A protein has these predicted regions:
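Nuclease catalytic cores that cleave nucleic-acid phosphodiester bonds
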Residues: 2-151
């Protein structure tokens, strides 16, 4: 088992590394040339800056039983299709039971944004310690489940 992080602007990299160290699970950070990262624990793979290049690279190297961390529903859907586990940086698990609805909501929201002529889209709220704790608990629970499923 490995953990793969769609690491462009991902706020939970250090949390993932700390928890993964406890379980001796290798971590791979994937980023494009606009977001070069370094890590003492994780392998870092830098991909060209093309649209979705990081996403496609991540999916090409993840396998059944791996854990994928991404805020991209499309990446999560492809990871689930390969038998990997997938989690959002909020701690919400992507599952085969919820991914179709999430993709449909994303599509409808994108359609609504296109038709509304609004140019400004409000960004996410500032991340809190509670957000980090929620993610850490959810991620650790996912690791335990993934380890059990390997047995």
């Amino acid at each position: 088992m490995r953990v793969f992080i769609d690491a462009d602007a991902c706020p939970v990299v250090s949390i993932v590394e700390n928890i993964s160290k406890k379980y001796n699970i290798p971590v791979t950070l994937l980023c494009d040339t606009n977001h070069v990262l370094t890590s003492e624990y994780s392998e870092v793979i830098v991909v060209g800056a093309g649209a979705d290049a990081v996403d496609y690279k991540l999916i090409s190297i993840c396998h059944r039983g791996d854990i994928v961390i991404s805020q991209d529903y499309g990446v999560a859907a492809m990871a689930l299709g390969k038998g990997a586990f997938a989690i959002h940086q909020s701690g919400k698990w992507y599952t085969n039971d919820n991914i179709d609805q999430m993709l449909m909501e994303r599509h409808l929201n994108k359609k609504a944004r296109r038709s509304s002529h609004k140019n400004h889209i409000k960004g996410p709220k500032k991340r809190t310690e509670e957000d980090d704790e929620r993610f850490a608990q959810s991620f650790e629970k996912m690791i335990r489940m993934a380890v059990e499923s390997e047995m």
